[in-house]
Amino acid sequence: MGDSTTYTRLITNQEVEAFAAISGDHNPLHLDPDYAATTPFGECIAHGMLTGALISAAIAMQLPGPGSVYLSQSLQFKAPVFLGDTLTVTLTVIDKHAKRPWITLQCQVENQDGKAVAKGEAQVAAPTTQETVTVIPPPALQLIEAASLSEED
């Protein structure tokens, strides 16, 4: 217990757009600067679950790492994440199951100012052997405006 890791990522407009395309969450709060300007946030914010996905990345790639199986996650969103924010996920092992290779992780996500934007706990089935893997980079994504798709019809 007590093992810990951090994972840091810059949140860009391109990542927010890609997350919207993949998730199907096209809420204008995330994608339309004119709409977002009328909200209490005053500008576009990232999807909450994009922040949650960074926790998943830290679990899968760092602690416990490749071969991990995500069992459950509790998550509270504490503050908005704006485009251009740099988020740091901190995972800390707070419990180990006595008979199974399960661990509980405290999950904290902070922005570049040290402000908590999300926190929670994750239950993970850790691999029982050390996995050595070659990380294959994902394919490049190219977002195409929906309007340009209809022009090709």
Predicted segments with their positions:
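Short, intrinsically disordered, mixed-charge
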Residues: 21-24, 60-64, 112
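Proline-rich low-complexity regions
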Residues: 28, 64, 80, 126-127
